[in-house]
Design a protein with these regions (language model features):
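Short, aromatic/His-centered strand-loop micro-motif at the edge of beta-sheets
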Residues: 135-163
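Ligand-recognition surfaces built from glycine- and aromatic
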Residues: 24, 188-214
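Extracellular carbohydrate-recognition regions
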Residues: 20-41, 207
Length: 214
């Protein structure tokens, strides 16, 4: 009877629902922007986000490509509002003289207020920032004072997977499945949009953009 009562108690507990969505961009017409996405920027310039066919696409045939130039080009997914969960994308740095950076955005309030984690193929590092009122600042790594992200090889012309898991003020950063570091910040505590990010003249391809709760 005791075991039976335990089963009844467990069955009455609310189930943890894990939801995730993935955008592969394969149902979008060539040279167009996906529906429910916004092409915007932090700062000045002219970002250019388009879906294009590419033989190296991780889920063929299409990728989402940023080929314009701006301070920080953004592509935000409008139909999202995520407080705790994850965001993940596959990316390939194609070119860029000033920068070759690819990032994911979460808890985005608008084009001037959000969190972003980016990998850089010119600097060979991964850094997590907050952008507040249009000003970007890097966050300290948990357990370390100062410094600038983590040095790690980010080969150009190669597909990588960048993922950030976030719960409350804690953020966990992974590159190609390897846990690089954690960071903490409580500037943006509520839900916000998710999206993609580049910098300056970075030409980057993105594929299999995923987000959800966990």
């Amino acid at each position: 009877m005791k075991a039976f009562n335990t089963l009844l108690l467990l069955s009455a507990l609310p189930a943890t629902v894990i939801t995730a969505q993935t955008a592969s961009f394969d149902d979008v017409k060539d040279r167009e922007l996906p529906a429910n996405w916004t092409n915007t920027k932090t700062g000045k310039g002219e970002p250019k986000w388009t879906v294009e066919k590419d033989d190296t696409a991780q889920s063929k045939p299409n990728v989402l490509k940023q080929s314009g130039e701006a301070t920080y080009p953004l592509c935000l997914k409008n139909d999202t509002s995520l407080e705790d969960g994850f965001v993940e994308v596959k990316f390939k740095s194609v070119s860029g003289d000033t920068d070759q950076a690819a990032g994911v955005i979460w808890r985005c309030q608008d084009a001037d207020n959000y969190y972003v984690c980016r990998a850089n193929a010119l600097e060979d590092n991964v850094v997590l920032y907050k952008t507040e009122k249009g000003k970007r600042s890097s966050l300290d790594i948990v357990g370390r004072r100062g410094g600038y992200g983590v040095e790690v090889k980010v080969a150009p012309q190669t597909w990588h997977t960048l993922r950030v898991e976030f719960s409350g003020s804690r953020f966990k950063v992974l590159l190609n499945g390897k846990h690089l570091f954690d960071a903490e910040d409580a500037t943006f505590a509520g839900a916000g949009r998710v999206g993609l990010w580049t910098k300056a003249d970075s030409v980057v391809m993105f594929d299999d953009f995923s987000h959800g709760t966990n």
